[in-house]
From Swiss-Prot:
One annotated Gene Ontology cellular component of this protein: plasma membrane
GO molecular function terms noted in the UniProt entry: sodium:proton antiporter activity
Cited function: Na(+)/H(+) antiporter that extrudes sodium in exchange for external protons.
Keyword set, alphabetical order: Antiport, Cell inner membrane, Cell membrane, Ion transport, Membrane, Sodium, Sodium transport, Transmembrane, Transmembrane helix, Transport
Compartment annotation: Cell inner membrane
Similarity field: Belongs to the NhaB Na(+)/H(+) (TC 2.A.34) antiporter family.
Organism: Shewanella sp. (strain W3-18-1)
Keyword Calcium in record: no
Protein name: Na(+)/H(+) antiporter NhaB
Residue stretches spanning the membrane: 10-30, 63-83, 96-116, 131-165, 204-224, 240-260, 305-325, 359-379, 391-411, 449-469, 476-496
NCBIfam families linked: NhaB, PRK09547.1
Reaction equation(s) it catalyzes: 2 Na(+)(in) + 3 H(+)(out) = 2 Na(+)(out) + 3 H(+)(in)
Topology with respect to the bilayer: Multi-pass membrane protein
Primary location group: membrane
């Protein structure tokens, strides 16, 4: 029996999403205008934010761009915000969008080098604790200079590569054979071996994911919101690192200890060992690759190392904006490694562009938050406190919201509100700088709790790898729990005990950083 037009509409709407999810989104689209026009724009605004958070939480049911985008389009259409305000938010965060477009694509052309490095870690080091630690620390180091999303994209590529190699060989084929590693129907695979390998990959990906948060919070390029906060505070790369260090250094040490402990005691789903048979396959593959590596291939690796040095130097010395450094990485790696085919270049942009579009939708929701003054009561309440208590409240408020909502727009909203308070004369410039540290660390550290908070975690959850290694939303939350508790508590203690304030004063006295004036914040605003 042919489908009716209404059945066809529901069938097409949001594709393969569950029917209840489709009905929920359609209900949201009907409810929002009623709330906005007949109840209260403030209530409608908060409902929209909660609905948007719901679409992020349900990322495995449907990629959030479409449902979130429909909610954002309707918000503009009914007057919750304007298209101009959305454009203004995107303009203000253009560097973040450029970072996602160019930096992620640039690192795509350096994957060979990173695959080479991570393959060596797994094949040469047999201790699971040591491998976990190396993945965590390597991710932390890379995330300090690259966007966390980029680092996770690389680790995903590494894990997919390992999974595909094992699946191919275990299915009775050789390394060069064409094979569909997503197929579940192969009877030759050893199920217990496959499950152990999946557990091992899940462990490494979660350690690496948390590593990106540990390293990402330290520098202005580590996470998209860091760049936004640094721009509002008018800090350069070095100053950002110094100002964050009283919180980020103790947190990094605590994170490393957590990595060791969860592996040692095999708790929260950690401690899965790499089966010997799988290790042998990966070692054979590494030996096969080494034996067949030509001088041309070796030269490509050398070029990628040199471009990596330029990348770190360019960012550390702030020689150009982050996005432009990323563009230079694309040009240098492709030019010297002979990648000139348009289709080969296009593949590099496939990973990041859907998320870049989703980020533009985030900024539409930020525009609603700003226009409807949704956060004003929270901000005013927090500013009514003084000293370390005020900093702790901002840290916790950012942290709680970042656990359930994307930390990019949480950080953006809070720094904008605090900047407005500075311009109104409610706080001093030194207080603003301390609050910027509390906001940055608050959005970055507790947000590892769920995939909603960390863009890198959401990217991992929505990747093609997640179903292959059975990494669900609930499992990610459970595995992130020990890190969430430790990182959040250590961050709070670093602020609450006065260590942040005392260390910052020491940095001023040692002339490592300087006192800024409020004009540094107001000037860019008025010149916009």
């Amino acid at each position: 029996m042919p489908l009716t037009m209404s059945q066809a509409f529901i069938g097409n709407f949001l594709g393969n999403s569950p029917k209840w999810y489709k009905i929920a989104i359609l209900s949201f689209l009907i409810i929002n205008p009623i709330l906005f026009f007949y109840v209260s724009p403030f209530v409608a605004g908060w409902v929209l934010v909660l609905e948007f958070i719901f679409t992020l939480a349900m990322a495995l049911k449907c990629y959030p761009l479409q449902p979130g985008g429909l909610l954002a389009i309707e918000a503009v259409a009914i007057g919750m915000t304007s298209a101009n305000q959305v454009l203004h938010e995107i303009e203000a965060n253009l560097e973040v969008l450029l970072l996602l477009v160019f930096m992620v694509a640039g690192i795509y052309f350096m994957k060979q080098l990173l695959l080479f490095a991570f393959t060596k870690i797994i094949t040469k080091v047999r201790s699971k604790i040591l491998v976990s630690l190396m993945f965590c620390l390597t991710s932390a180091f890379l995330s300090a200079f690259l966007d966390a999303l980029t680092v996770i994209a690389v680790i995903i590529a590494v894990a997919v590569g390992f999974y595909a190699i094992y699946h191919k060989v275990a299915s009775g084929k050789d390394f060069s054979a064409v094979h569909d590693h997503t197929s579940e129907s192969n009877t030759q695979l050893n199920n217990s071996e496959l499950e152990s390998f999946r557990g091992f990959l899940r462990n490494l990906l979660m350690h690496a994911g948390v590593g990106t948060a540990l390293g990402g919070v330290c520098t202005m390029v580590g996470e998209p919101q860091n760049l936004i906060i640094a721009a509002q505070a008018n800090w350069q790369f070095g100053e950002f690192v110094v100002r964050m260090s009283p919180v980020t250094v103790p947190v990094l040490i605590a994170g490393i200890l957590t990595c060791l402990l969860v592996e040692k005691f095999r708790i929260f789903g950690y401690g899965a060992k790499l089966p010997d048979a799988v290790h042998k396959i990966l070692c054979d593959y590494a030996a096969h690759e080494d034996a067949h590596r030509t001088n041309k291939d070796k030269m490509k690796l050398v070029i990628q190392v040199l471009v990596g040095v330029w990348l770190i130097a360019g960012l550390a010395l702030h020689l150009a904006s982050v996005g432009l450094v990323g563009l230079s990485v694309i040009i240098l790696t492709t030019a010297f490694n002979g990648i000139t085919d348009e289709h080969a270049l296009g593949k590099a942009f496939e990973e990041a562009l859907p998320f870049t579009a989703l980020l533009a939708v985030f900024f539409a929701v930020v525009a609603v938050i700003i226009d409807q003054h949704l956060f004003a009561p929270v901000i005013q309440w927090a500013l009514s406190y003084e000293g370390n208590t005020q900093l702790v409240i901002f840290y916790i408020a950012n942290g709680l919201l970042s656990m359930v909502s994307d930390n990019v727009f949480v950080g953006t909203v809070y720094i904008n509100e605090v900047k407005a308070a500075l311009i109104d004369g409610q706080i001093t410039r030194d207080q603003f700088d301390l609050l910027a540290v509390a906001i940055n660390t608050g959005t970055n550290l507790p947000s590892v709790a769920t995939p909603n908070g960390q863009a890198a975690f959401l990217f991992l959850l929505t990747s093609a790898l997640a179903p292959l290694i059975r990494l669900s939303y609930g499992r990610m939350v459970w595995m992130a729990l020990p890190y969430t508790i430790v990182l959040s508590v250590v961050g709070v203690l670093a602020i609450e005990t006065g260590f942040l304030e005392q260390a910052t004063q020491y940095f001023y006295d040692s002339h490592m950083i300087i006192h800024h004036s409020a004009k540094d914040v107001i000037a860019p605003l008025t010149s916009h």
